[in-house]
Design a protein with these regions (language model features):
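Long, low-complexity, proline- and polar/charged-enriched segments
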Residues: 80, 86-151
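Central antiparallel beta-sheet cores of small beta-barrel/beta-sandwich binding domains
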Residues: 23-99, 142-144
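Short alpha-helix capping/helix-loop boundary micro-motifs
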Residues: 168-172
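Residue-level recognition of short, solvent-exposed, well-ordered loop/turn junctions
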Residues: 173, 179-182
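SH3/SH3-like beta-barrel fold
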Residues: 181, 194-199
Length: 217
């Protein structure tokens, strides 16, 4: 059974190193970690985007808790963010609010457990201590990102198929494509286009993706 959830949540993320000027600094946990967490910082406009995925597995079944968030003014300690559901097959129609707090090298996510519909309230606790704790009616997710990078943003594919393009031009479509739910690291953008890298099982794929094929806030 897939999880149905919309999170009215307070996010506190501690650990995003912000670099001003011409340098870029973004962070991620290892892709196999549970929960997986990645954050992109765009120094040009101070925008932060991020993604979190937590899984609960059982024989023949995997339940997911995934979200995508975005905030502005990353040079400040507290950032208001918008949050959307990033779980495949579930609606992204509801826009929720949260907050990011930036300190040191630790990311912490605090969720009001009573506001988690569906099975998300038992997917997150399933991950267990020390990544997930429950205190005073809240689920607290803590991760330590070890991978730094230069991506400017994080995105998630919404279309059933999102083809790669050699250039930001419809005439340059390639055979390779991504599917709904795939996560992207965005390195550049043109009107209507993202230049992205996607880490596949065997190799990294890069190219241009149409913005309209991704989840938008």
């Amino acid at each position: 059974m897939k999880i149905r959830y919309l999170i009215n949540v307070l996010f506190i993320v501690t650990g995003l190193k912000i670099v001003h000027g011409s340098e870029q600094s973004s962070w991620s946990t290892e892709i196999y970690e549970n929960p997986y967490f990645t954050v992109g910082y765009d120094f040009r406009n101070g925008t932060v985007t991020g993604y979190m995925a937590a899984l609960r597995t059982a024989p023949g079944e995997t339940n997911e808790c995934k979200l995508l968030f975005k905030g502005d003014r990353a040079n400040k300690a507290n950032i208001s963010v918008k949050v959307v559901n990033a779980t495949v097959g579930q609606s992204q129609s509801a826009m929720l609010s949260g907050q990011l707090e930036i300190r040191n090298n630790r990311f912490q996510l605090v969720v009001n457990k009573s506001q988690l519909p569906g099975d998300c309230d038992w997917v997150l606790p399933f991950v267990g201590y020390p990544a997930v704790e429950e205190k005073s009616g809240q689920v607290i997710v803590t991760v330590l990102p070890m991978i730094s990078g230069v991506w400017r943003a994080v995105g998630v594919i919404q279309a059933k198929k999102a083809y790669f393009y050699q250039a930001p031009d419809e005439a340059t479509v390639q055979k390779a494509y991504l599917v709904s739910g795939d996560i992207l690291h965005i390195y550049d953008e043109k009107p209507g286009w993202y230049f992205v890298k996607f880490q596949g099982r065997k190799k990294e794929v890069l190219g241009w993706i149409r913005v309209r094929d991704t989840i938008q806030f």
